[in-house]
């Protein structure tokens, strides 16, 4: 049986159960995309995982991780300028980083076409907010496709790539968390049989202008608007913009009811109609910008009441209300009225309740969901650092150096979890790379309270360097603790730029900091807790900018790598010497490794399936009750 790795490059068409991200990866390959770039971020990283599975000799494409989303977009755009079909993907908030370039790209002629894949995150499942990136399509004059299923993710990527090449422009493909991670039987087309064409085609004398000086901006913007208007004609006849009537169409309580929707809410509405049997039609939009105005006007004209059903912001609602006014529609437009409905994902349960509030004569809210009889509710579990994580060891050491009134600033990454007990480090968080700059601001006019910022090595390369340069140039009175685990761990252990793992140059942090003007710099292993505590105390006493690097490899990645190299590899969990343990619970209450289990009688044991035997906890027990068991044969 063929593996998914083999399926990705199978030249024949096939059908298989795959997740949405894998479907997109296959669509890239069989539609002839030549250059793909990314900065890792949920919910899209499995696209990268799939692309990286293909051996180099079988790839018809070049795939690279970039320093950040802006760089990733610009590399892909440069390839598209040169005539190579290109794509870039990143998470929702990554578009904030790339926005400077995204807004400008529609003004250019991108001969190869460019698909920009956005991993939006309604519900903020793995993001610091749930921003709605549909507004960027309006701001940048860009078409946007919105798949609702893995099959549509595959199909609409192919349509987006074809449209981007035809019009020589960027096209947005907006995925959401459910579409990325849902699995479905996906049918794919055969791969393009022609060999990759790497002929460079950029010619600054044709299809210009390419430089937006004042006299060129209007012609460039005019071209962007004309291209967008041509896409509106495509939207009117696109097969992905269609009316669905699972139960036919008939008046309900004397009114013809309709729904305009897209993406996950459209599928949720279909499920509700399937369960309830109401004869309500849905105009489902797969190409949601520009809106197919004629098709929507016709839909409004054939219904008495129409609900605009969408997640997050009132994007379609605002535009459809304007369209209804312009067209003189007599249909009553309904929309969300509860503030809570502007937050989170709209699954079947929430859509059913929303429909019941909108049309109580046609829908009932349904019974509340409950755990099956006899089954207890799941115990709430906060996210936490893995057993053996060097960040835990670092936080335990740093906390011993902090003063009671110290201000601590978090950043994005696994170390964000330090804000929870027992560490409680990281009192404010904005976005990637903000930590050192926000700490700089907090230090101004604040001589009595030391500000300590934290940043991971991947985030540092992504967006931390300008803040470090600023802090060094102004000699801000702050401490920066760099937690270096050598990878981009939180999103799946993608190769960190500058680590050397991707075959590129290795960029050591010490000379980088020195080049940025850092004068006070200390380094040690995060497991060397006494040394790290001493370094942080010294840094806090230093007047001005001080940097401490706490380095230890991600232990989850390390143990997985060891098991791949040697299937017989086994970890050796630590143990509790019950004769020494006085049940003061430092291991649980202060160090906080989830491998320690406190019993009802107060005793502590080690969970053998969780402990990886790293030993970072040995130095934390005041009575040395945490011990390494002897190996067979008596060796310790």
Name every feature range the model reports, one short phrase each:
Residues 2-21, 25, 31, 147-385, ...:
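Flexible, low-complexity linker and terminal segments
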Residues 47-50, 75-77, 98-102, 125-131, ...:
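Short acidic, glycine/serine/threonine-rich loops at helix termini
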Residues 50-57, 270-282, 446, 511-518:
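Short helix-loop-beta junction
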Residues 58-66, 108-119, 199-205, 473-486, ...:
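A glycine-rich helix N-cap at a beta->alpha junction
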Residues 1-150, 178, 248-253, 279, 417-549, 555-563, ...:
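Thiamine diphosphate
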Residues 89-90, 115-119, 172-178, 260-261, ...:
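Short beta-strand segments
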């Amino acid at each position: 049986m063929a593996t998914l790795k083999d399926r990705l490059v199978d030249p024949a068409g096939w059908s298989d159960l795959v997740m949405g991200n894998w479907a997109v990866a296959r669509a890239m390959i069989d539609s002839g995309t030549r250059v793909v770039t990314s900065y890792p971020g949920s919910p899209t990283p499995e696209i990268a995982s799939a692309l990286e599975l293909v051996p180099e000799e079988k790839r018809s494409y070049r795939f690279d991780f970039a320093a950040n989303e802006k760089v990733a977009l610009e590399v892909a755009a440069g390839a598209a300028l040169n005539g190579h079909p290109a794509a870039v993907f990143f998470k929702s908030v990554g578009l904030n980083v790339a926005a400077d370039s995204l807004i400008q790209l529609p003004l250019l002629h991108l001969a190869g076409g460019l698909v920009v894949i956005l991993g939006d995150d309604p519900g903020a499942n793995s993001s610091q907010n749930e921003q709605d990136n549909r507004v960027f399509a309006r701001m940048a004059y860009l078409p946007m496709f919105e798949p609702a299923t893995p099959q549509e993710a595959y199909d609409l990527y192919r349509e987006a790539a074809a449209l981007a090449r035809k019009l020589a422009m960027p096209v947005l493909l907006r995925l959401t968390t459910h579409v990325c991670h849902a699995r479905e039987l996906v049918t794919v087309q055969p791969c393009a049989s022609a060999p990759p064409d790497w002929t460079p085609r950029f010619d600054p004398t044709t299809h210009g202008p390419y430089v937006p000086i004042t006299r060129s901006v209007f012609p460039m913007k005019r071209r962007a608007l004309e291209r967008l208007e041509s896409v509106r004609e495509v939207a009117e006849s696109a097969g992905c913009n269609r009316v669905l009537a699972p139960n036919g169409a008939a008046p309900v309580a004397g009114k013809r009811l309709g729904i305009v929707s897209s993406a996950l809410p459209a599928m949720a509405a279909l499920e509700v109609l399937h369960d309830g049997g109401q004869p309500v039609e849905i105009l489902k939009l797969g190409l949601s910008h520009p809106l197919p105005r004629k098709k929507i006007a016709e839909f409004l004209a054939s219904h008495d009441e129409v609900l605009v059903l969408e997640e997050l912001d009132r994007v379609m609602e605002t535009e459809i209300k304007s369209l209804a006014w312009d067209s003189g529609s007599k249909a009553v437009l309904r929309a969300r009225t509860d503030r809570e409905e502007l937050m989170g994902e709209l699954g079947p349960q929430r859509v059913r309740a929303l429909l019941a509030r909108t049309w109580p004569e046609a829908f009932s809210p349904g019974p509340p969901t409950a755990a099956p009889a006899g089954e207890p509710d799941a115990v709430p579990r906060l996210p936490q650092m893995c057993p053996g994580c060097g960040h835990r060891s670092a936080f335990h050491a740093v906390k011993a150096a902090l003063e009671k009134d110290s201000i601590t600033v978090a950043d994005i990454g696994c170390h964000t979890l330090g804000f929870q007990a027992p560490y409680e480090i990281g009192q404010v968080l904005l976005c990637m790379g903000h930590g050192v700059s926000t700490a700089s601001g907090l230090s101004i006019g604040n001589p009595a309270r030391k500000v300590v910022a934290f940043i991971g090595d991947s985030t540092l390369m992504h967006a931390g360097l300008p803040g470090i340069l600023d802090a060094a140039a102004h000699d801000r009175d702050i401490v920066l603790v760099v937690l270096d685990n050598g990878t981009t761990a939180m999103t799946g252990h993608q190769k960190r730029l500058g680590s050397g793992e991707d075959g590129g140059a290795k960029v050591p942090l010490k000379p980088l900091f020195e080049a940025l003007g850092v004068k006070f710099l200390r380094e040690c292993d995060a497991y060397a807790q006494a040394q790290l505590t001493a370094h942080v105390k010294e840094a806090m006493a230093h007047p001005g900018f001080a940097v401490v690097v706490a380095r230890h490899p991600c232990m989850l990645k390390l143990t997985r790598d060891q098991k791949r190299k040697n299937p017989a590899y086994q970890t050796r969990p630590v143990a509790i010497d019950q004769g020494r343990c006085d049940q003061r619970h430092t291991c649980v209450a202060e160090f906080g490794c989830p491998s320690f289990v406190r019993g009802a009688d107060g005793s502590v044991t080690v969970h053998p399936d969780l402990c990886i035997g790293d030993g970072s906890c040995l130095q934390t027990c005041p009575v040395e009750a945490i011990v390494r068991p002897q190996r067979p044969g008596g060796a310790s």
